[in-house]
C-alpha cells in the first residue's frame, strides 16, 4: 500500500479552493450571450472549440492532487446538473464557486461549518420554492423557440428547428441530433412507428426505383417465433388473399420453405406480401411486438399463451393506413389500434421509466413511448468544417435538453434575473442560531454571481447592472446581448425553471460538503528509479 499525504483544516481547504477556482474560472468565461470560446487541445486531430460548460469541465485535470480533488468535486456539480436538466452547467459551476468563496470567509472567521451548511440548505429550499411559484408554463411554439435559442447561445435558427420538431412529434416524441452532410441545418420527421428492421428478402420490394415495399391498408400478422413451415401460414394466406389486401408478417424470422413460398406468391401477384424480422432481442422483442399489436389492433400469435399460427384468423390480424418497408427500416403509419389501449400502454411504459435505474433502459423505454405517442424527429446539423460541426452539435444538444426541461417545469426570467429576484424571498429569513443565519446570508450574496458573470463577459460593469436590476420589479432585467434593460420574458430571454433549480441545488450541495471538509488524503507519488542504460552497444560510434 502506497504512503498517503494528509492535510488538515485551512491548509486542506485552501488547496481545494485553489482547484475549484481554476476549473470554475475556465468554465465561467462561456456564460451568457457574449460568453467566450474555450479551445481544448486534442492529442490527435484538430483542437476542439466549445462554449459548453460541461465539456470544458470534463477536460480539466490538475497536477496537484489536492487541488485536483477540489476541481473534480465541482466538475461533479456540472455533470449532475447536465444529467438531470441537460443544461445550466456553467450556472451551477459559477454558483458553487460563489457559495464556496463566500462560505470559506465565515469558516476562517471561526463559525461552525455544519451550521453554515444548514443555513445554506434552508435558504436553497426557500429559493427553489420561490422559483417554482413564479415559473410560467412553456407550452406554445414561441416560448419553446425562445428557450432553445437562449440555450444554443442566442442562435435563433436552432431554437426554430427544435420548436418545429416538438410541434411535429409532440412533447413525448423522440428528437435526436445527428451530424448532417451539408452546410444547412435540416429537420427530418418520421410520423408513425419506425423500427430498425427491413425486409427479409429484396424480392419483397414492389417499388423498384426506391427499392421499398409499400403496402396500402395491409393486414399485419405478428408472430413471436421462427416460421419455416409454410403449412402453418396457409390458412392465414388464403383468408387474406380473398380480401385482396396486402399482408405484412413480423416474426422472429421467416426462412426455408416458408420464405420461398411467400417470395414466389408475391412475385406472381397472387398475394402482395412482405416479411420482416421483429425488432429488438429477448424480452425487449416481446415488449415491442406487444407495442405493435396495440398500435395496429392485432394479437401476437404466441405459443406461450396457447395460440397456434395454424389456427390464426383475420380477427387476430392488425391493420394500418400504410406501411413502408425499406432494406433497413419499417414505418407503420396510422395503425388501427384503440386510442384508449394505446394511452394505457404509454402510461404503463412511463411507469417503467420511473422505476428503471439504467440510463440505457430508460432511453429505450422513452423511444417506445415516442413511437406509440408521437413520432421521431432528427435534427441534422450543417457546418463548413468538422470543428464547427462538433461545437454546434454541443450547443444543439444543450438547447434540446433545455427545451424539454422548460416543457416539464415551465420557464422563469433568464439572464440570472430569477435568482436575483429570489433574494426577496430570503428577506427576514433566520436560522436557529447566528451561524445558520450567516449561512442564509452566504447564499443571498452568492445567487447574484451568475448575473455578475454574464455582465462581466459582456464587458459591462456588474455592480451597476446588479443595482439597476435590484431596483426593478418582476421580470425586469438586463439583456447582455444588446445592453438594454427591460422585461426579460418580452425580450424572449427565458430559462427553464428546472435548469435554474437544479443548478442551485447541486451547487449548494457540493459547496456545503466542501465547507464541512476538515481533512484531505491522497497518495504520495512514488519516485521510480530511472531506467538503466542499454548495454552491449559498444562500437556504435
UniProtKB/Swiss-Prot annotation:
Q: Which reaction does it catalyse?
A: ATP + H2O + a folded polypeptide = ADP + phosphate + an unfolded polypeptide
Q: What is its EC number?
A: 5.6.1.7
Q: Name one GO molecular function term.
A: isomerase activity
Q: Which GO terms describe its biological process?
A: protein refolding
Example GO CC term: the record gives:
cytoplasm
Q: Which UniProt keywords apply?
A: ATP-binding, Chaperone, Cytoplasm, Isomerase, Nucleotide-binding, Stress response
Q: Can you say where in the cell this protein is located?
A: Cytoplasm
Q: Where along this sequence does the record place binding of ATP?
A: 30-33, 51, 87-91, 415, 479-481, 495
UniProt xrefs under HAMAP family: CH60
According to its UniProt record, which protein family does this protein belong to? Belongs to the chaperonin (HSP60) family.
Q: What does this protein do?
A: Together with its co-chaperonin GroES, plays an essential role in assisting protein folding. The GroEL-GroES system forms a nano-cage that allows encapsulation of the non-native substrate proteins and provides a physical environment optimized to promote and accelerate protein folding.
Q: Which proteins does it associate with, and in what oligomeric form?
A: Forms a cylinder of 14 subunits composed of two heptameric rings stacked back-to-back. Interacts with the co-chaperonin GroES.
The protein depicted here goes by the name Chaperonin GroEL
Please give the organism. Answer: Acinetobacter baumannii (strain SDF)
Q: What is the lineage of its organism?
A: Bacteria, Pseudomonadati, Pseudomonadota, Gammaproteobacteria, Moraxellales
